[in-house]
């Protein structure tokens, strides 16, 4: 199935003034309601990474789990879950970050990675980059490296992809939106 960025964009619902006034939230749930669109998204990522040399997939809580788990299954890679604060039961590492809405913490089990591991980080969207930057810092604290940061959507005007690239982390997104695009 050939990737069609327009087809994907047409299924991402803009929700005006959510979660606060002035924000256009990019709702990806319609992608998951369409088997064709979900297959298109999953296959696009799988085809990009099928022959690449990394050891783990790291998925961001919560929407990153949806696509990250599919890709981990398709590529037969271990899946590392980067969770919101207070959700993991064992020893954790935590990292604070700023979002477009405020401040938050992301956590990962301290034994998730070993020195020398290489991780593909996956999320639904790159906005300010806060979540993925925090996850990258956690990966590095465990002695591993970030192979690439990937998402379905990029909001380049918020600078997250550029911040990741400035850290030496390549980025890949299936589509992008301007902040005012509906």
From Swiss-Prot:
One of its GO terms (biological process) is purine ribonucleoside salvage. Gene3D superfamilies: 3.40.50.2020. InterPro entries: Ade_phspho_trans, Adenine_PRTase, PRibTrfase_dom, PRTase-like. Pathway: Purine metabolism; AMP biosynthesis via salvage pathway; AMP from adenine: step 1/1. The keyword Ligase does not apply. It holds the Pfam family Pribosyltran. It is found in: Cytoplasm. Its EC number is 2.4.2.7. Keywords: Cytoplasm, Glycosyltransferase, Purine salvage, Transferase. Its main location: cytoplasm. GO terms for cellular component: cytosol. It comes from the Bacteria. One of its GO terms (molecular function) is adenine phosphoribosyltransferase activity. It catalyses: AMP + diphosphate = 5-phospho-alpha-D-ribose 1-diphosphate + adenine. Catalyzes a salvage reaction resulting in the formation of AMP, that is energically less costly than de novo synthesis. Homodimer. Belongs to the purine/pyrimidine phosphoribosyltransferase family. This is Adenine phosphoribosyltransferase. It comes from Pseudomonas fluorescens (strain ATCC BAA-477 / NRRL B-23932 / Pf-5). The gene is apt.
